[in-house]
Amino acid sequence: MYCLKDLKHLIYFEKLLENADNELVQKAQAEGDICLGYTCYHVPEALLNVGNCFSVRLRAPHTGSIDIATYYMSNYTCEYARALVERGIEGGYQFLDAMIGVDACSMMNRAMEHFEILKVNEKPSFFVTHCDIPYKITDYTLDSYVDQMRIHVLDRLTEVFGVDTSDAAIRAAVAEHNEVCSIISEMGEMRKADNPVITGYEFHVINLVSYTCPKRLILPYLRETLAELKKRKPDKVSPFRARVAIVGSEIDDPDLTKLIEGCGALVVSDRFCFGSTPGREVIELKDDEDALRQICLHVMEHSECARYIADEKVLQRRETADRLAKEYNAEGIIYEQMKYCDYWGFERALASHIMHDEYGWPVLSIDRLYNNGNSGQLRTRVQAFVESLEIKRIHKEEGKA
């Protein structure tokens, strides 16, 4: 379908996403680095890359049966949480040195509990830590959040592994984190073009490897890919029939983006968990303020998680979806939700109507399984949505004539 010249490292990036314990993770650990697993944006990524630590945002690629995890967690819990437990029981996370969990939702909390109870990692120094996450932004919730990160994350890393978690070390980690964010953001800006030099699938793959690989080892590939994209020539005519923004819960499977684009809809914005919004915004640090507190405030302010129930955050999520769809010239919005996701179940049901009725956006609202890249039913719904967007465009053009 695509005539764009293949990106040099795309196949390698896809290979890195085949397993959580990928080639670069193994290389970093062989060099003595400490691997920290996490699942949620509410664990500040930069903090997990302090000193000789590196973060891996956990996925369970090619998940098949999750029957054993379902036995422990019931079939009314989100499949992402169950897939992680299933992969852990299979031994797929033995490479981790620690698991940094957050009580962002009850299902992920249950998953982290099972990492401990079922002893899915046999390393003597392995530990699972849990952090409580706020529902709204106030001085006291920020104070609590900072304490949680200091006590349950930074102090534990120092106690168990002797990691330097000083203010200077945190700032160094943020500098490296910001370079990754700047590169991904610059690639993202390219998606605003009428005929972009990067597809949504390619961007999804590149963004995912930035979450799942050691920063110092993936950065050279990201730098080279950015330089390559700057010289890449777009197709003379775009092969896509529509442009869409995706909003919603966790998507770590780029095959879902591939499915949507295979239906003719170019994905131009990724406002979902594991996406670039939020997650790939540069963290601006002031020299005269505590770095940890600034990072925690940054995460709280930029979070688009449906966990936040304050009126201003609910409005922020809608305004962000509207802003991104406009900035990236989307013609419609796909609101998606992992099946049994409590927070996004409520958010999707309400916001999908509000974005249509009050903001005027064509909206496709879907709930989906964890791995949905080959769903015939979903493909049919996306194809119908693309056709509806084409019809709207035709009517709009006829109205101007």
Predicted regions located by residue number:
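TerminUS-proximal long segments
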Residues: 317-325, 330-332, 336-342, 347-401
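A charged, amphipathic alpha-helical module
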Residues: 1-34, 146, 155-282, 310
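Short, acidic/turn-prone active-site loops that include or flank metal/cofactor-
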Residues: 59-65, 70, 133-134, 271-276, ...
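Metallocofactor- and cofactor-centric catalytic cores in central/energy metabolism, strongly enriched
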Residues: 8, 15-29, 37-46, 65-69, ...
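Acidic/His-rich segments in extracytoplasmic proteins that coordinate ligands and/or metal ions
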Residues: 83-156
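Glycine-rich, highly charged phosphate/nucleotide-binding loops
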Residues: 72-90, 309-322
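Redox- and metal-dependent alpha/beta enzyme cores, enriched for Fe-S-associated oxidoreductases
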Residues: 30, 41-42, 47-59, 248-313, ...
